[in-house]
């Protein structure tokens, strides 16, 4: 199921429902051995599993990175995405980079290694300021990935008090 979802995202960056349709059109279910196919509920179940295991997945992927990847340089970017739906735990009104007024959004932080390969993604409430996402990334790199000296590179300056980085 996880491979089917990845294939669907590579072929067409649509919704989960479009992934089900794509699997029917391209025989992905048959190729991967899903004798009864799959539906949107199966994909949501898969996303729940990924969410529950995200930390372990990211840690394992980090440990298998290219040997040339630095353990002390990381690239970090923050963006937001507005939502049309009503029921999302993280949705809140906040600074919208797309200029969408009156829309709830989520804030997304993407952490990459020095080669630009993603190592972690984190979702924050939509009213979280960019600077407030920074400390959790330092903590993640230190505690989860075991890196001692870290330089985070972003697209604009983020000022963090020294005592916040030593917690």
For the regions a language model picked out, list residue spans one by one.
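Anion-binding and metal-coordination hotspots
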Residues: 1-167
